[in-house]
A protein has these predicted regions:
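Glycoside hydrolase catalytic-domain context in secreted enzymes
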Residues: 1-170
Length: 170
């Protein structure tokens, strides 16, 4: 199956952000509805989508290092809402983990975001891929919910095989 690396459905929070033009809206409801319809349209034509950048990746400056601190309410009602809508209403096939940290955990190995919320609460059945070079570990990422490391196999190649064979990852 071919996969579109999009749509990018982060909230347009910073007007001067380098990738704000990619995001659908500053309004979480509108972003969610647009993401749902984009996903349905693409996947109805046998093209998988990969919703990005999950989650709270709303600025370019220091995006690979920033540790986002946000209230539970703001996170759920603003920043996660478009992702939740596209997962629940359109069964998005893929999600791309963002570069940043959320509450001290890299998005690519964030058990709460990937396993508990995305898969647990929302019922996501697809694959989670890292942003390019956005994987930071083997065991923590594998157990934290990441399925595919992009664009190489630094952590999910031999290191992952060794972890599986050692019984650290199952």
């Amino acid at each position: 199956k071919d996969m579109i690396l999009g749509p990018a459905i982060n909230i347009q929070r910073i007007p001067t952000g380098g990738r704000t033009y990619e995001y659908l809206s500053e309004d979480p409801l509108l972003s969610g509805e647009l993401a749902v319809n984009y996903t349905l349209g693409a996947q109805d034509h046998q093209e998988a989508v990969c919703l990005k950048h999950y989650a709270l990746n709303n600025q370019e400056n220091m995006r690979g290092f920033v540790d986002v601190k946000v209230s539970e309410r703001a996170m759920r009602e603003i920043y996660l809402a478009p992702f939740e809508a596209a997962v629940k209403k359109a069964n998005a096939y893929g999600v791309m983990a963002a570069y940043n940290k959320v509450s001290g955990e890299w998005c690519s190995e964030n058990d709460r975001l990937l396993n508990k919320i995305l898969r647990g609460e929302w019922g996501f059945k697809g694959i989670v891929i890292s942003d390019w070079g956005g994987t930071h570990s083997t065991t923590k990422a594998a157990l934290g919910g990441l399925d595919v490391e992009m664009p190489n196999d630094r952590y999910f190649g031999k290191a992952l095989l060794d972890s599986v064979q050692a019984g650290v990852v199952s």
